[in-house]
Amino acid sequence: MEKLLVLGLSFLEVTGAERFVMFTQAQEVIDFIAQEEIAYIDVRFCDLPGVQQHFTIPASELEASVLKDGLMFDGSSVRGFTQIHESDMKLIPDLSSAFVDPFRANKTLVIIFSIVDPFTDEPFSRDPRQVAAKAEAYLRSTGIADTCYIGAEAEFFVFNDVRYQVSPQHTFYALDSDEAYWNTGRSEAGGNLGYKVPVKGGYFPVSPADDFTDLRDEMANLLTEVGLTLERAHHEVGSGGQQEINYRFNTLMAAADDMMKFKYVIKNA
């Protein structure tokens, strides 16, 4: 029987957790590219601070050998990786992570890659995906559990205006949200109807106080397209546009990939 370690889950059951898997073999990718007329392959990986990076190659140039042997890149130009004298690094694709980008004008297949040393093929110690893989392997080695499920409670703000500047003589930031309580006295086109969210009064109000229902619905649709299983979406407590969209927990590596997908979709929707 599989032993489970569940973290970050307050009201979810462990049953039914499975990763959205698009491909398991290289030939499946090649066939999909031809059948779906994919124009580009977006190669993605994560830097040490946790920011996803990418570059794009024409799908016509993708050979099956690349999906097995990987791609070379300059690791010295990526934060936290290597120095110039040891810049060569190799990216190895995780075919199970693939999804079609919902935002690109040209049909693009995204594949998430892990990083290895090009000379030894050993996992790169500062690749966040490799750190996650090592953590999962260590958990299994302890006998505490075979599988660890991670559930992220993903929350974010939607602002109408974000400004900041840092200069030698001047530093500031300014945020604004049309629905926020500090705009009750603001003159607005067509008149200010007063439907503003009070301080810490944003939890679960219906429209017109909640002005983001349609946006959350669109975000939820896009998240489903890229493979996440959605569970609920709502306005959060914060007056200035705080939102929450919950998606199903997953194993550590898959949960980390899901969070990268989540951030990409939310910021681009």
What are these regions (language model features)?
Residues 20-269:
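Glycine-rich, acidic/polar active-site loops that bind/position phosphate-bearing ligands
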Residues 9-21:
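Short, Lys/Arg-enriched N-terminal segments with co-localized hydrophobic residues
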Residues 7-10, 128:
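Generic alpha-helix initiation/capping and coil-helix boundary signal
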Residues 4:
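Cationic, low-complexity basic patches in intrinsically disordered or flexible, solvent-exposed regions
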